[in-house]
A protein has these predicted regions:
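Pre-active-site segment of Zn-dependent metallo-hydrolases
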Residues: 3-206, 238-253, 267-310, 317-322, ...
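Metallo-beta-lactamase
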Residues: 229-253, 335-399, 515, 519, ...
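Active-site-proximal beta-strand elements of phosphoester/diester hydrolases
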Residues: 257-260, 274-278, 371-378, 400-406
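Divalent metal-coordination and catalytic microenvironments
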Residues: 268, 278, 309, 330, ...
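Active-site HxH/HxHxD metal-binding segment of metal-dependent hydrolases
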Residues: 293-360
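Active-site environment of divalent metal-dependent phosphoester hydrolases
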Residues: 311-315, 337-340, 363-366, 381-382, ...
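Active-site-proximal loop/helix segments of hydrolase catalytic cores
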Residues: 314, 318, 378-475
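Short acidic, glycine/proline-enriched helix-loop-strand junctions
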Residues: 450-451, 455-459, 471-472, 476, ...
Length: 539
């Protein structure tokens, strides 16, 4: 920054990217609830870091192979081995109770798996590990298999919810070639980053991100950073510029604007209402400056955000925390209530100071000149009992749009029952992640026993394929079809961990889907980077 006075207007640079961290790891949804955070810290983070320390040369070589970017290879240099050792030691020394909570889950699972006779569970309460006593209810399913239910609200009030492990990391796109994959590499305070030791609910977060469009004075910037514990070689002054943003929002005066935001994100906008679906906003830099919709192009107020499911590429705190100051309400699918693999999105978001509405399947929410409807979502979760997933239909100003994200169609009878909600669609948007990873890639840390390969290989994170999507289209005959949510954009590789080519099965399925829908004179468009569709008001 220049030295032109304390009251000079300063804006957060468009190329600034932000990563919310939990114990130096990228904070995806399962690192917010205490028990799942403990499991991933114990069974994923420590395991990968210890593997790196013991075999760092192998990790360094693997990290250079693009096709391995989504694997469990820690992307750090040999010079950072000692820092990883320190992070291991700090985690095991200072957060011993937290790790013991993870072990308590394993012990409780073992206790209940051994109770096979189907007799009352009441005597087992005395054998529940001490750290979980009073936080779990022991239950049977209808087939007399014992399990437990977590009391999530109480756990958020306990010592196991540790916001002191939350920190903020800032970087400049011009200083990095590629961001490491988020699920395999902790974020160290290196020369290219500024890390701020404060929790996600600090007003600092909202004030900083407001300054993308609402300038701060130098005095205000200094005051925000004053007293904060800072680490890393990037000076906070370098995050700001005197140049106001050149990319600004566009107003909608009539009809409905559908704007694709990249990956799984959409914006639906009328004159009076703005709705985002699964927003993941890319950071603008010189390489992609004209290819994306950036933070500065979003409206000053976002009435609703609809989230489809609790995967890191759909509930993205990197984006949501940057938008929190301008979000009205977040709408989320109803939760099972207490299942380890299915933490409550409502509780999670409320803990991060979002105004959150939880809706049941087929429940409708009235909005200005329209309705938001929760549509049942099957698939993409490895057959785990996870209820926190929903597709959405949005009716606005007489237009009707469906956003299916990664939902699959294993039984077309569901969509036959749903036709009253899906008739007269202007837009049918569906993902085609038909070759997902084994479910243990994402949920392995929650398993307390080794999962056989025969199970892993069949239970995958699969969404729709061409055949499944075509069955739905044949029923509902939408005007427009978009395929999206595949992570095609290379700038999202850091959280998707995948690359595609012409021979990729997903690409072949999109071609097959497009050929099939020609019989109904409906074109399929595969979305990439950004796309606008204006739906005029014909009334």
């Amino acid at each position: 920054m220049s030295n032109d006075g304390e009251n000079q207007n300063l804006y957060l640079k468009e190329e600034v990217y932000f990563e919310p961290l939990f114990n130096q790891w990228y904070a995806w949804p399962y690192l917010i609830p205490p028990v799942t955070a403990a499991r991933y810290t114990d069974k994923t983070h420590l395991r990968i870091m210890k593997s790196f320390v013991n075999n760092y040369k192998l990790h360094i070589l693997a990290a250079q192979e693009s096709e391995l970017s989504g694997g469990e290879f820690l992307n750090c240099s040999e010079s950072e081995v000692e820092e990883i050792k320190s992070l291991i030691d700090r985690t095991e020394t200072h957060y011993h109770d937290f790790l013991e909570l993870s072990k308590a889950v394993s012990q409780l699972d073992k206790l209940l798996l051994n109770h096979t006779q189907g007799t009352s569970l009441e005597p087992l309460y005395q054998q529940v590990p001490d750290l979980l006593k009073g936080y779990v209810e022991l239950t049977f399913d209808r087939h007399h298999r014992a399990g437990f239910r977590l009391l999530e609200p109480l756990l958020y009030q306990s010592k196991f919810y540790q916001p002191q492990l939350q920190t903020l990391s800032f970087g400049l796109m011009s200083k990095v070639n590629e961001r490491p994959f988020v699920l395999s590499t902790p974020r160290l305070a290196d020369d290219d980053h500024q890390q701020v030791n404060t929790h996600f609910n600090d007003r600092f977060v909202d004030e900083i991100f407001k300054s993308r469009t609402q300038p701060l004075s130098r005095t205000q910037v200094d005051a925000l950073f004053a007293g904060k514990e800072l680490s890393g070689g990037l000076a906070y002054e370098d995050l700001f510029t005197t140049q106001p943003p050149t990319h600004k929002p566009e107003n909608v005066k009539d009809g409905v604007l559908l704007r694709y935001l990249g990956h799984a994100g959409f914006m639906v906008q009328s004159e009076y209402v703005t709705i985002l679906i699964d927003p993941i906003i890319a950071t603008r830099d010189e390489k992609i400056k004209d290819d994306i919709v950036s933070f500065t192009q979003l409206p000053d107020f976002i009435d609703y955000v609809c989230l489809t499911h609790t995967h890191q590429d759909h509930v993205n705190f990197e984006t949501l925390l940057q938008l929190r100051h301008k979000i009205g309400k977040i709408i989320v699918p109803k939760n099972n209530g207490g299942e380890l693999q299915d933490p409550s999105l409502k509780l999670m978001l409320q803990k991060l100071q979002f105004d959150t509405i939880e809706v049941d399947e087929c429940e409708q929410l009235a909005i200005h000149s329209g309705i938001i409807t929760s549509i049942p979502f099957f698939g993409e979760h490895g057959d785990l009992n996870i209820r926190s997933k929903s597709a959405w239909t949005i009716e606005l100003e007489g237009k009707k749009l469906f956003f299916g994200a990664d939902s699959a169609n294993p039984d077309v009878n569901l969509y036959k029952h749903l036709t009253p909600y899906l008739t007269d669609l202007d837009v049918y948007a569906i993902g085609m992640e038909c070759v997902g990873a084994p479910y243990t890639w994402l949920y392995g840390a929650l398993c307390t026993a080794k999962v056989p390969n025969t199970i892993k290989d069949t239970r995958r994170l699969n969404g729709s394929d061409a055949s499944q999507a075509s069955e739905v289209v044949e029923l509902i005959k939408p005007k427009h079809i978009f395929v999206y949510a595949l992570g095609m954009e290379p700038w999202y590789k850091y959280f998707m961990g995948i690359e595609y080519n012409e021979n990729s099965e997903q690409v072949q399925q999109i071609k097959q889907f497009s050929q099939t829908t020609q019989q109904w004179d409906i074109q399929v468009e595969s979305l990439f980077a950004k796309r606008d569709l204006f739906l005029p008001n014909l009334g």
